[in-house]
Curated annotation (Swiss-Prot):
Gene name tied to this protein: IGF1
A GO BP entry: positive regulation of cell population proliferation
Chain positions listed as propeptide in the UniProt record: 119-153
Subunit structure: Forms a ternary complex with IGFR1 and ITGAV:ITGB3. Forms a ternary complex with IGFR1 and ITGA6:ITGB4. Forms a ternary complex with IGFBP3 and ALS.
GO cellular component, one term: exocytic vesicle
Disulfides per UniProt: 54-96, 66-109, 95-100
Subcellular location: Secreted
Function, in words: The insulin-like growth factors, isolated from plasma, are structurally and functionally related to insulin but have a much higher growth-promoting activity. May be a physiological regulator of [1-14C]-2-deoxy-D-glucose (2DG) transport and glycogen synthesis in osteoblasts. Stimulates glucose transport in bone-derived osteoblastic (PyMS) cells and is effective at much lower concentrations than insulin, not only regarding glycogen and DNA synthesis but also with regard to enhancing glucose uptake. May play a role in synapse maturation.
SUPFAM superfamilies per UniProt: Insulin-like
Pfam families xref list: Insulin
Name recorded for this polypeptide: Insulin-like growth factor 1
Length: 153
């Protein structure tokens, strides 16, 4: 009797295993399809080469590439450049009218500024004036006010 009662259990297990195998086969086939689709899109974009960027797309790309440094629309020129030079080309000429790549965009990024120490930043703030200077400044501004009617002669 043990074999008879286990027969339905074995049939259920066998059918369930076959169902899982089919399900796994379908899932793996769909995964393979999506994987092939992704690879195809990557290879076609890799062979497409540089693109043209204009307007807001160009600005967005420059902001992404340069980050906090900022960027120039024209190539920065050195001091003392001659006035008889060729007309200056900018990022629009290079990336909108023609195609450009990432290296070309990076050429228009502003240079990195050296980090300032906490002391030099504090020295530049106008709120850190000595107390005596603040008081003098306040006294001088209140002299000519017409709201104060206590004039001394």
């Amino acid at each position: 009797m043990g074999k008879i009662s286990s027969l339905p259990t074995q049939l259920f297990k066998c059918c369930f295993c076959d169902f899982l195998k089919v399900k796994m086969h379908i899932t793996s086939s769909s995964h393979l399809f999506y994987l092939a689709l992704c690879l195809l899109s990557f290879t076609s974009s890799a062979t497409a080469g540089p693109e043209t960027l204009c307007g807001a797309e160009l600005v967005d790309a420059l902001q992404f590439v340069c980050g906090d440094r900022g960027f120039y629309f024209n190539k920065p020129t050195g001091y003392g450049s001659s006035s008889r030079r060729a007309p200056q080309t900018g990022i629009v000429d290079e990336c909108c009218f023609r195609s450009c790549d990432l290296r070309r965009l990076e050429m228009y990024c502003a240079p990195l500024k050296p980090a300032k120490s906490a002391r030099s930043v504090r020295a530049q703030r106008h709120t850190d004036m000595p107390k005596a200077q603040k008081e003098v400044h306040l006294k001088n501004t209140s002299r000519g006010s017409s709201g104060n009617k206590n004039y001394r002669m």
